[in-house]
Every structure is written in C-alpha cells, then in structure tokens.
Amino acid sequence: YLRILRYLRFFLNYSKNDHSENLKKIIRKNIDGISKISSERLLDELKKIFKSKKFLNLNKDKFLVEIIQLIFPQLKNLNILNNLNETQKSIITSNDFFFMISVIIIDETDNSDYFIYKFNISNEQKNRIKLLYNFYLENLKKNIFTEHNLWKILYQNNKELLNDVINFHIVRDKSSLKKLVKFKEFFRDKEAPKLNVNAKYIMEKFNIKEGPSVGHTLKKIEKQWMDNQFKISEEKISEIVNS
C-alpha cells in the first residue's frame, strides 16, 4: 500500500501525462489498505511529498488531492497553496516540514489537535504547532498582530518561534502582506528584551526575606514591564513591591 503514496510522489514530480482511468480505479479500490501502514511510516511518506520539488503544484491535480486527502483528512485546507505570490512560495519551500504542515492544518477547528494526536511527533514540534494555532485564533478574535505583541513572543519564546509566527501569517494573510514583510525585516537582527530586575535585587533593595512573595512580586513587575513597552521605572517597582 505504500506504493500508492510513492506513486503520488512520483507522479507529482515527474509525470507529464494524465493518470490512466484504470489506475485511478485500482488506487481507489485499494485505498482502505493504507490503514494497515503505521502512522510513523505514513508521516515519513508525507514528509517526502511535502519536500518534493513540485509540491506547490499539487493542487493542479485533482486526483492527487483527492487521494492525499483520503489518506490524510487533516490536509483539508490544501487550497491555501493556490495563488501564492513569490514571497509566500519562498517561505513555504525554504522552511521545514512541520512549518509547512502547520500552514495547511491550522484553522478555526481542532484539526491541528487531531493531527498532533494521530501522529507521533516530538514535544518541541507539538508546542510549535500549538503556539501557531493559539496565535492564529487570537488574531481572528481581534487584531493582535502588532509590533508590541511580537516583542512579547520574542521575549517569552525565542527567535525561531517568532519567525514561525510571522512567516505563517505572511502565507495565510494576503491582505496584510506588506505589513508582515516589514515586521519580518524589522525583527531580523533584534534580540529579546531583558528585565534587569531579579529576586536578589528586590530582597536587598527593599529588605524582603526570601519566600513565595518574592516570586509573586517579580511576576507583577514583569507584567507591568511587558505591558509598558518593556520599560519600568524605579518608582513603579517600589509601588508594586509595597502594594
């Protein structure tokens, strides 16, 4: 049954002819046998398809799309690959498989959660997909795609995840393309902001004993610092400590 997936990949990359009707019937007749293949093997074959040199041409072949979506129903949003500009194409083809799959599986439903459940992927990649999913949902509710919120992502996560978020929305949000490309360029050489306040500083300056209250106070200071464009005065720190 792996031959079905390998045929799809071969046809996508090399064939210049149409699928024969007889072969279509054979594949459709045997498609249920795919369930006998392990999820690890299926994921490996899917990676090969996604990293194929002609991957972005996939939607031009209705039969390929039909069979791939029967095998991988989570790929219901393959139409996202239609009408991409050169910037969007470059982002997709230059990124790794898990970024590519995130672009396809994330929507308003639990589709991406089901993909994570079905396939055995690392916790790092699970968290990566979940971050993109959560940010996508938040952005649907209200426009949170601002420079300040991107700074927060950089501070709370890392540069790689920030790039994921920006790249994801460049591909998915054609209406804001110029703004998103500017954000990408702006953050290219930026480092995460640093809060120059720690537990030792608070205990020594305000004569506070070590304990849970120090941690709670630090969290309040950090929140104020983040909400205020990553700035906080000595007066505000004192106010929070003594509140």
Indicate where each model-derived feature is located:
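Short acidic alpha-helix initiation/capping motifs at coil-to-helix transition points
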Residues: 1-4, 21-22, 37-41, 50-53, ...
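Solvent-exposed, amphipathic alpha-helical segments
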Residues: 26, 42-45, 49, 220, ...
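A residue-level signal for conserved active-site and pocket-lining positions in enzyme catalytic cores
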Residues: 4-7, 61-62, 133, 202
